[in-house]
Design a protein with these regions (language model features):
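Fungal secretory targeting signals
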Residues: 1-30
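N-terminal secretory targeting modules
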Residues: 27-226, 236-238, 257, 434-442
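Structural recognition of the beta-strand scaffold that forms the well-ordered cores
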Residues: 82, 222-227, 231, 262-268, ...
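Catalytic nucleophile-elbow at a beta strand-turn-alpha helix junction centered on a G-D-S/GDSL motif
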Residues: 220-245, 270-273
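Short connector loops at secondary-structure junctions
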Residues: 257-275
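Oxyanion-hole/transition-state-stabilizing segment in secreted/luminal serine hydrolases
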Residues: 269-327
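Extended, charge-rich intrinsically disordered regulatory tails
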Residues: 305-307, 315, 342, 347, ...
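Catalytic His-Asp segment of secreted/periplasmic serine-dependent ester chemistry enzymes
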Residues: 312, 352-442
Length: 442
């Protein structure tokens, strides 16, 4: 019988213990902290020309018996992080054998092959396992790692693949504007890959690493930017982190207050389109993966800055251009609706100039479409706020062209100073206005 004093078993004590256990679990579940992204990139299928250099792209496998060292630019201070690795586009399982994180060596930064002595932390998975076999199409998250990182600083992530990934279909982000290092053998803890072994190579791409999350206070939040090569940093300086989102981050950090607790997550890729797959999945489809499905309650803001590649690759005739303009506007409406359903403020950015000698995107019919779409972005009232990049960087005498001071040379992408002007065009008050996100719209 329950409650017998002779056995020492008490129903009352049993229930009290059970309630305490449940209470403890509930307190943990309701912690005021959250996991939130502090770095990210848009995973995509790596094109043949962007695979790692020989001998790391052999016919049967990529990265076979190879160490890969990559650096990323952190956007928020943190002391506990975890890493996500994507095999979304892999044609086979991705066998991660070992991994570490570290700080770059003193006096170095983005693109460095060297790490700071004593800063290395071993990365584990699923409760302490040293590696993970990531199924094709899947994503894996590491165990939490205690390491102090600062906003606008660099973190080094090193991976070792004993057998490599079979085939030539792998996941990565070619437009890293950051140098990565490769070496034969397991060198995840090596002080400097460039002097560790023969056969060391470098490439300006990222592979497999898709996000870094941090365990942050509830006040922390994030801006996700859905964009194309202009946001991905074409025309910026390799290893300098001077894309326009990087320079916007500098403004937020300098502003302090609540603004310094906003991460910026660059979910852009060169050649990306809203209405059709190209270099990476179309933005209308990937907004679920790249924004809505991201962790934490801090996903407060999203900025949509795409459309130039849809206009520029659509046929030149007026009927086709009328159609692509109409479809872009409808797609913006869909993206806004879906962001609002998640309580996320939806910001829109006007499409920047794309005309110039020999620039096919700047044909008159395409320019008409750009102007029409921009007027809708500015005047429809559908976006919660508008960032007028077009007005900020266009030539004051010929609004169809970039100001020559900001042009990287192709009449489409900007140089680092132009990206500074874009970053300055963002009114920081919009982040305070929508600090709690938005109400869920009917």
């Amino acid at each position: 019988m329950f409650g017998s004093s002779s056995t020492g078993f008490s129903l009352k004590n049993f229930l009290t213990g059970a309630l305490l256990l449940c209470s403890s679990s509930s307190v943990s579940a309701k912690s005021s902290n959250q996991w939130i992204d502090i770095w990210g990139c848009m995973p995509q299928l790596v094109e043949p020309g962007n695979l790692p250099p020989a001998p790391y792209n052999g016919g049967d496998a990529v990265f076979k018996n190879a160490t890969l060292r990559q650096t990323v630019y952190i956007t928020q201070d943190a002391s506990i992080i975890r890493l996500s690795f994507s095999n979304a586009f892999g044609g086979s399982d991705l066998p991660i054998t070992a991994a570490t994180v570290a700080l770059p060596a003193s006096g170095t930064g983005a693109g460095s092959s060297a790490i700071k002595p004593g800063s290395t932390k071993t990365v584990t998975f699923s409760g302490g396992r040293p590696g993970f076999l990531v199924p094709n199409g899947a994503l894996v998250v590491s165990d939490p790692i205690k390491i102090q990182v600062k906003a606008q600083s660099v973190l080094t992530v090193t991976l070792y693949f004993a057998t490599g990934q079979t085939g030539q279909s792998i996941t990565g982000h070619p437009g890293s504007r950051t140098t990565s290092w490769l070496a034969p053998g397991n060198l995840v803890s090596a002080a400097d890959l460039s002097s560790s072994a023969a056969g060391v190579a470098s490439t300006d791409h990222w592979y497999f690493l898709s996000s870094i999350e941090a365990y942050q206070p509830e006040r922390a939040s994030a801006l996700y930017i859905v964009g194309d090569s202009i946001t991905d940093g074409r025309g910026s300086t390799t290893n300098a982190n001077n894309r326009w989102p990087d320079q916007l981050l500098a403004r937020l950090q300098k502003a302090g207050r609540s603004l310094s607790s906003i991460s910026i997550i660059n979910q852009a890729a060169g050649g990306n389109r809203i209405l059709a797959d190209g270099l990476g999945p179309n933005a209308l489809g990937r907004i679920e993966r790249d924004v809505l499905a991201r962790p934490g309650n801090g996903v407060r803001y999203a900025l949509i800055f795409e459309g130039v590649n849809d206009i520029g690759t659509a046929p030149l005739d007026s009927v086709s251009q009328q159609s692509v303009g109409d479809r872009l506007i409808s797609a913006y409406e869909q993206m806004i609706t879906r962001l609002h359903s998640g309580g996320i403020a939806a910001f829109g950015a006007t499409i920047t100039p794309m005309s110039g000698p020999g620039q096919a995107y700047g044909e008159p019919e395409r320019e008409k479409t750009r102007q029409r779409v921009n007027e809708w972005i500015r005047r429809s009232g559908r976006f919660d706020a508008v960032v007028d990049f077009d007005r900020a960087v266009r030539d004051q005498k010929n609004g169809t062209m970039l100001d020559k001071r900001w042009d990287s040379g192709d009449y489409l992408h900007l140089n680092p100073e132009g990206y500074r002007v874009m970053a300055e065009a963002v009114d920081l008050k919009i982040f305070e206005r929508f600090a709690e996100g938005v109400e869920v719209y009917l």
